[in-house]
């Protein structure tokens, strides 16, 4: 009888595969991320390594989509550079992302702002939201 109780306690200590993955992911996640919503204008500090030096390059634009959750959470940031639309996808918990700062809140009524791709000039502006 003592053997069966020992075996059951060992089985209780062993985590299920999902719980093991969750515990590992929670240790890898960043906890200092701001609340980011679609439509916000954000400045992402991206780590760039050139030779043996490392520097942080800012990338500022409008968040047009958010995907996934947990460790694999990504945002797509769009900006216009020299008249050409440039989009980058950032994994929020990646070590390449040094910092994220919300510059201004946007007021939108969609979860994905892919319609901004077809717009030009002032039509790409997003109204500002003051309540968040």
Swiss-Prot record:
Disulfide bonds: none
GO molecular function, a single term: structural constituent of ribosome
Keywords associated with the record: Ribonucleoprotein, Ribosomal protein
Highest taxon of the lineage: Bacteria
Pfam families for this protein: Ribosomal_L19 (PF01245)
One of the record's GO cellular component terms: cytosolic large ribosomal subunit
Gene Ontology biological process terms in this record: translation
Family membership noted in the UniProt record: Belongs to the bacterial ribosomal protein bL19 family.
Job description of the protein: This protein is located at the 30S-50S ribosomal subunit interface and may play a role in the structure and function of the aminoacyl-tRNA binding site.
Protein name as it appears in the record: Large ribosomal subunit protein bL19
Source species: Synechococcus sp. (strain CC9605)
């Amino acid at each position: 009888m003592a053997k069966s109780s020992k075996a059951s306690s060992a089985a209780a200590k062993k985590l299920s595969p999902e719980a093991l993955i969750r515990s590992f992911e929670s240790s890898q996640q960043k906890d200092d991320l701001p609340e980011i919503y679609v439509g916000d204008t954000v400045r992402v500090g991206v780590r760039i390594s050139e030779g043996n030096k490392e520097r942080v390059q800012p990338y500022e634009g409008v968040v047009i989509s958010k995907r996934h959750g947990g460790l694999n959470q990504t945002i797509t940031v769009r900006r216009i550079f020299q008249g050409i639309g440039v989009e980058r996808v950032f994994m929020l918990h990646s070590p390449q992302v040094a910092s994220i700062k919300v510059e201004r809140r946007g007021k939108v009524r969609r979860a994905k702002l892919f319609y901004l791709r077809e717009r030009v000039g002032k039509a790409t502006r997003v109204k500002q939201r003051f309540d968040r």
